[in-house]
C-alpha cells in the first residue's frame, strides 16, 4: 500500500506545483472483430484445445461480452447448463467459466442441438482459454554466474573448495540430488527432529548447490562456486520457508560447536527479517560471535528493496559479510535490500548474482520456476549469498591461514566497480565480488596510509602508479559518530572518483587503467573527527613520491561547502497529510540530501525528493526509522521535499534537515 500511495502523492504534487495535470492520451475505440466462422466465438487456441477433448470434459474459459448487461443475461443460461462461474468481473464485462466442451460448442455457435438451435449467447465478443501465465524472466545459469564472479578462473588454477566445509543454515538439503550426492557430511534438524537430510521447501537445496554443487545432473553446466567443498545441513526453517529466531540462533550455535568435527569454515544464512535492524538483536550478536569463533559468516541482505533502511537481522550484524543481489549485467535488482542499517552503518558489503539463478531443485518441491526435474530458477539475495559463501571456500583453500576478517577485507577491496558513480553505496556496497582478484589480494601491490582528521578538516596522500589495470582505495575509520568522505585525483589534478555515503563503515574509490604518474587521495571530514586508514590496492606498481618527484602535483578541489536549511512542521494522516519545502540548488552542486526526524514510536512519515521539473528522483518510506533522501550532481533550480504522513497517532511533529553540497 505504501508504494501505491507514493505514486498517488507524486502525481498530486505535480498537479499542485504545475497548476495542471496533463490529460492522458485518448485510447482508440476497441473494434469488435468477427471470429473466423470455423472457430465460431472461440479463439484459435481454445478451438485447437477442445479438438483433443471429449464432450463431457470440462474446460476453463474467459467469456468476453460487449457490455455488462449482456454478461448478466448470460449468467442464467450458463447456470442452466451446469457451468461453474468462477468469477463475475466488474472491471471488464467478462465471466470466468468452467464448462463442458459440448456446452461450450453450443454457446460458441459451433453446434446445433435442436434445443437451442444455432442461437448464441447475445453480445459475446469471444471466448478464450483460461490459460496459465508464467513469470517472464531472464534466467542466469550457474555457468554464467560463475564466470561473472570469476570463480571459473579459480577452477582453472586448481581451486574448487576441497578441504572446506560450508554450513547451510536453511530449509534443509536434498542429499539425494545428483549435484549434492556424497557432499552432505553433517546434518541436524531443529524443526522436525529428523536424522536424515531432507528439504521440504527447496530453498536450502537451491542455496547449497549454488555454493558447492557438482552440476552432475547437467554434465557440469550448473556447477556451484566451490564444487569440491563439503556441506553440513542445518535445518532451522520449515516447509513454508519460515522459522523462529530461537531455532536459527540454535543453528548458529550448533555450527560453532561442531565446526572442528566437520571442518566447517563458512556458514551461509540466506534468511532474515524484513524490519530494519541496528545489529544489536540476539541473532545479530550470535552471528557476530560465530565470526569471532573463526567462521566466515555470509548473510543475505534481504528482499525488501528498493527503499533505504531495509536491511534486517542478521544482515545488520557488524562483522558478517552482507550480500546484495545484481543481475547478469551487474545491475542491482529492485528487490535487493538497501542500507544503511537502523543505526546508519553502511550495508551491504558486496553484491553477487542473484536474479533468477538456475540451481538444484529438491525432489518433490516446486520453489521458483522449475526448469526440469533437477533444476529450478529463483531470484533473491538468498541466491547471491551462496555465491559469496562458495567464493569464501575457494579463498580459504588457497589461503588456509586467512582469518574471516582477511577474507572480508579481500572481497571488499578487490570487488569490481559496477556502479558508474560512487562505489561505496547502500545498494552495491563495495561492488560485485571477484573471486580471482580476491585470491590474488596478497600478490597485488598495496600501500596503507594512516592519519587523523579533525572535524571539517582534510588530509591528502600521494602515491605513484605504473603498469596498472586498476587501482582502488578504501577508507576505514574508528569513530562511528563521524562522517568521512574520500576523493581520488589523477596526475593532472582532475577529480576522477569520489565516495561520500554519509554512513559509517567504509568509503571506496577506484579507477580502471590509471595513467602512470602521481595520484592523490584526499580524506575529508564532513562531520566529526576520527583516526583513519586508507588501503590502496593495484595490479600494477605502487610507490610513494620522494621530494615531490617530477610528476605534476594534483590540485585538489577546495573543501566542500554546504548550504543547510532546517524546516519544522506538523502533519496528520487525516487532516494535514503533507508539507512541501523548497531548496535552491546553484551550479556546481555535487549532492542534495534530506533527513527527516520524528518520533518513530508513534508515527510513520515518508520523505520524497523532486527535481526542478517535478520528477520524483528519490523516496524514503521506511516503516520504523527516520527517512533519508539524496541525489548526486543535482541540476540547478528549485528542488522540492515532500513530507507525507503515512500513519500518525494524532499530529506528528517533525524536523527536516536539507543540505546542498558544493565542491
Swiss-Prot record:
What is the name of the protein in this document?
Answer: Subtilisin-like serine protease
* Enzyme class at the top of the EC tree: hydrolase
Provide the activity regulation entry from the record. Resistant to treatment with 5% SDS, 8 M urea, 10% Triton X-100 or 10% Tween-20. Fully active although less stable in the presence of 10 mM EDTA. Activity not affected by the absence or presence of 10 mM CaCl(2). Unstable in the presence of 2 M or over GdnHCl and loses 35% and 99% of its activity upon incubation with 2 and 4 M GdnHCl, respectively, for 1 hour at 55 degrees Celsius. Nearly fully loses activity upon incubation at pH 2.0.
What GO terms describe the biological role, i.e. biological process, of this protein? proteolysis
Pfam families listed in its UniProt record? Peptidase_S8 (PF00082), PPC (PF04151), Tk-SP_N-pro (PF18237)
Describe the function of this protein. Serine protease with a broad substrate specificity.
The UniProt annotation places Ca(2+) 1 binding at: 420, 423, 497-498
* Disordered: annotated span: 537-565
In the record, the note on similarity to other proteins reads: Belongs to the peptidase S8 family.
Q: Present the record's domain note.
A: The C-terminal calcium-binding beta-jelly roll domain (445-562) of the mature domain is not required for folding or activity, but it is required for the hyperstabilization of the protein and possibly for its adaptation to high-temperature environment.
Is Transferase given among the entry's keywords? no
Listed GO molecular functions? Answer: calcium ion binding; peptidase activity; serine-type endopeptidase activity
The chain positions of domain Peptidase S8 read 139-439
Residues cleaved off as propeptide: 24-136, 563-663
Q: Which UniProt keywords apply?
A: Calcium, Hydrolase, Metal-binding, Protease, Serine protease, Signal
Q: Where does Ca(2+) 2 bind?
A: 483-485, 501, 507
Temperature-related behavior of activity: Optimum temperature is about 100 degrees Celsius. Highly thermostable. Stable at 80 degrees Celsius for at least 3 hours. Half-life at 100 degrees Celsius is 100 minutes and at 90 degrees Celsius more than 3 hours.
Q: Quaternary structure?
A: Monomer.
Leader sequence segment? 1-23
Organism in which the protein naturally occurs? Thermococcus kodakarensis (strain ATCC BAA-918 / JCM 12380 / KOD1) (Pyrococcus kodakaraensis (strain KOD1))
Q: How is activity modulated by pH? A: High activity at a wide pH range between 7.0-11.5 at 20 degrees Celsius and pH 7.5. It is not fully stable at pH 6 or under and at pH 12 or over. It loses over 85% of its activity at pH 3 or under and at pH 13.
